[in-house]
């Protein structure tokens, strides 16, 4: 899908409002389950079969409590915008119809609504969540602060989630499969890329806790630093952590004799670089 033209920096409320055809309004009705097709704009890729069956059992007992959201797609056909789990569970439960809100909205608004609806839920895996957040940032030019407000998370949580996409692909796959947790990933991000993969593989093999991976990450970093004074080295390590948290990218303070030095900031995508400039208060458009 093409990126949104001329939408950089606009608020999410404006995006959603401008994408709707308010002349027709929303319609609450029932729609044949077979007439709905999966949406193109879903953050969710992986759906747990056991959880889906539990939802289907609930629907058999109580019906579909919350309508799905769709838009018209051809004659008597609908495209799903939000509510894929409910729609799939309704099929398992044997329902032929499902309550639905029919909206008349643009592609970009359908994308935003579908992503936000899924991101507000708790059961996305960390990589699905990061990929959904990245689409909101890339395709709509939304700031981390705006995204944070939309999905009900802190700005630092958004930045930390997006940083997961800088991990090596095999490590991302471990997160996708939930063999590693978000806490493991945060600890791994402090290390060079080659060491991230090595430690991740050991963590999965040995079933290490988040605390254990944090301890080993810190030990690996300390082994690389010259320590003329232990207190000074600890201070620099703490400063690295503070800069990384504040700027949303890996940061490293390097000193010579503790009198002069340099600060190195690492980024691996244009989007990460753009966010860094934003955090530094630099308004730059290439």
Swiss-Prot record:
GO biological process: chromosome segregation; positive regulation of sporulation resulting in formation of a cellular spore
Keywords: Chromosome partition, DNA-binding
Gene3D superfamilies in the cross-refs: 1.10.10.2830, 3.90.1530.30
GO cellular component: chromosome
GO molecular function: DNA binding
One Pfam family named in its UniProt record: ParB_dimer
Family, as annotated: Belongs to the ParB family.
Entry function: Involved in chromosome partition. Localize to both poles of the predivisional cell following completion of DNA replication. Binds to the DNA origin of replication.
PANTHER family: CHROMOSOME-PARTITIONING PROTEIN PARB-RELATED (PTHR33375:SF1)
The protein's name in its UniProt record: Probable chromosome-partitioning protein ParB
Lineage of the species this protein comes from: Bacteria, Pseudomonadati, Pseudomonadota, Betaproteobacteria, Neisseriales
